[in-house]
């Protein structure tokens, strides 16, 4: 046997190592390529959404500043930690907060809808830009929480009864557009173990349109021990209407001159209300200032009544249409505001100042960016 001419037998183990090394290198190359593709897609998305992103960032900075001012005006302990002795501190502007929040909602809807389109139609996770999607979503939720605090629960802070020494949550409560009053007796009822009830229209707690004369006419005596009621009152024991349903009044002649104008305006608003109806939009779709958001959320929760952090229980007042608006909350609002269409968030903010019990989530038509009041 010629040992010199014999070739050594190759081992199979180095070959396996080489294959594993090659596959590992190939996987790393694919991962790098995917990262570059995602970066390119994110750049492309941000270039398309540049105006919306710029508007969102500017308004979010403005909203953070306004939220700080609002907190400092409510709790003085935040003033020194955030503003120190500088002259930057000033008074908060509720109107500016509402308009800025509405602008944030509009710009974030544009961003989130575009990223959602890329995710559904191109198969890109988070639309190719997860950081942008999270920033837009959390900024939008922050704007919603501020709006909810300033609008939905505004009446809870200004609920009637303070002049009588009544405490909100203990003696008076607002629920579904009605002012609930707790009786002095310890009677077990349906709300909080107390006898919560809606007072008669003549009660000082009740709000009726116009002046106190409405309450006088509400129990106008027409003879034969019968009363004429101008307001429906389901809470009253004798709410069933009996006797004459009309009485005579003197109307100034000047009212006839504005009849046509008022009628045409009423018809225009009624047409808008009928044609558009009450569109129920989808819930807000699923933003980097995490620490600031958490800090502001905590401060708002402990300082402002009605500010509800995401995930906490809350009372939601639903906008159910003109015909179902209770008489208590039909005052101090032009009828044209209750059913109108605006196409800009600034105008929507103007309307929200009057609609104290309107859920902003019910006013955003995300795809068309039309706001219904």
From Swiss-Prot:
Q: Which portions of the sequence form the region Disordered?
A: 1-22
What the record says about family reads: To P.anserina SMR1.
Identify the InterPro entries for this entry.
MAT1-1-2/MatA-2/Smr1 (IPR031472)
Q: Which cysteines are joined by disulfide bonds?
A: none
Q: Name one Pfam family in it.
A: MAT1-1-2
Q: What is this protein called?
A: Mating-type protein A-2
